[in-house]
Amino acid sequence: MGNLISTCSFSSRVNSTAKITDSSIWYPQPDQHISIRTFRELNQAPTSSPTSTRTEMFLNGVLSRSTDDLQGEDSRQPMTLTPRQLTQEVSRRLLM
């Protein structure tokens, strides 16, 4: 397994006690495989498992992507949001 690379973002609203923390962990693999696991915390109550796992593989200049949603079919979202955009979207949906 390669070096650990991680990122974290935090969001809260003035008129709410809800606080959301999103973090992603990257484990670069041999031959440029990249595995990404995303975790979400609401009000600092950690989830027991990753919410999704995305794998990217570069072979001969071709990118292959695979995303496993570990929360079920109803919660599938495209994995094209930045951490900040993801936090804003989750905040919007939770605080509606």
Curated annotation (Swiss-Prot):
Function: Pathogenicity determinant. May act as a suppressor of RNA-mediated gene silencing, also known as post-transcriptional gene silencing (PTGS), a mechanism of plant viral defense that limits the accumulation of viral RNAs.
Compositional bias segments (type: Polar residues): 77-89
Subcellular location per the Swiss-Prot or TrEMBL entry: Host cell membrane
CC per GO annotation: host cell plasma membrane; membrane
Classification of source organism: Viruses, Monodnaviria, Shotokuvirae, Cressdnaviricota, Repensiviricetes
GO terms (BP aspect): symbiont-mediated suppression of host innate immune response
Membrane topology: Lipid-anchor
Lipidation (N-myristoyl glycine): 2
Signal listed as a keyword: no
Annotated family: Belongs to the geminiviridae protein AC4/C4 family.
Keyword annotations: Host cell membrane, Host membrane, Host-virus interaction, Inhibition of host innate immune response by virus, Lipoprotein, Membrane, Myristate, Suppressor of RNA silencing, Viral immunoevasion
Full protein name: Protein C4
Organism: Tomato yellow leaf curl Sardinia virus (isolate Spain-1)
Family annotation (Pfam families): Gemini_C4
Region Disordered, annotated ranges: 66-96
